[in-house]
Design a protein with these regions (language model features):
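A structural signal for short, hydrophobic/glycine-enriched beta-strand patches
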Residues: 1-174
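A transmembrane-helix-recognition feature enriched in membrane-embedded lipid enzymes
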Residues: 174-193
């Protein structure tokens, strides 16, 4: 229900755009005795953006500078992703990082400040997050090609007893879906016409 809005695109069918925009939420930064420990969560966002760049879908890649309240460090997520992208061979001059953003709405504003309006972008985020993210970026005047990654669900081909046993993983996926539905509801109320 949450992930099904947009099908995954084949890269060769995607046109070149002004920028590839990789949304935050793919890692957690922990600081211990002035050393940083990076924990990957939804790394598919990062690697999906790199793949699009290497396939020459844009000359620019933007990492949003997510700085979540639980990351009590000086580094933003965008800064860390830029560092890793350079290590993976992306030209530093082709990488932009937005100012700090706490949520998807702030990410859309920060990208708009960098690019302006009426730009064509490929938006890279988790499948469950795409519907809300795409809507917010379109409201900022972007022409969005949705590139979904990090699918949390897969179709059940055959139902058997194992599928019916509750699991912590299923509970976690339910929590993600519930949070996303609440986020959609909130933004629908906020931006009613």
């Amino acid at each position: 229900v949450v992930e099904g809005q947009y099908n995954k695109l084949e890269i060769e069918k995607i046109n070149e755009v002004d920028a590839i925009v990789v949304l935050g939420g793919s890692l957690r930064i922990n600081e211990l005795k002035n050393k940083y420990n990076i924990e990957w969560g939804d790394a598919d966002r990062f690697f999906g953006g790199l793949k699009l760049y290497k396939e020459k879908k844009s000359k620019k890649i933007i990492f949003t500078g997510g700085k979540m309240p639980y990351n009590l460090t000086k580094l933003s997520e965008g800064d860390v992703l830029k560092k890793y992208a350079i290590e993976y061979g992306i030209n530093a001059d082709d990488i932009l990082v937005t100012k700090d953003a706490l949520n998807t709405f702030e990410e859309s504003e920060a990208v708009q400040e960098l690019l302006g309006e009426n730009k064509n972008i490929i938006l890279v985020t988790s499948a469950f997050h795409m519907k809300r993210a795409k809507k917010l970026f379109e409201q900022k005047g972007f022409n969005v090609t949705a590139y979904k990654v990090d699918y949390k669900t897969a179709p059940i081909v055959k139902i058997n007893f194992i599928n019916l046993i509750p699991s912590a993983n299923s509970l976690s996926k339910t929590e993600i879906a519930f949070r996303e539905i609440l986020g959609r509801f909130y933004y629908n109320l906020l931006f009613q016409d």
